[in-house]
Amino acid sequence: GYGNGREIRCESTSGRYTTCGYVDRRQHVEIRRQLSNQQCVYGRNWGVDGRQLWVDDGCRAIFVAY
């Protein structure tokens, strides 16, 4: 369920591309709480590349993988 997901904090500082840990390919990842003023949009400034969570262009958020 939603409550037992693993939280991953991922922050793009100075607009830089950043990777933040690994997720299982079967897991669903979504934003739990956005921390940046910049809107985080999936596929544009955050996503999962293979098994790595990434952010870019100032997106900062707490994600949850479950």
Say what each PLM segment does.
Residues 1-66:
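Glycine- and aromatic-enriched low-complexity segments, predominantly in secreted/extracellular proteins
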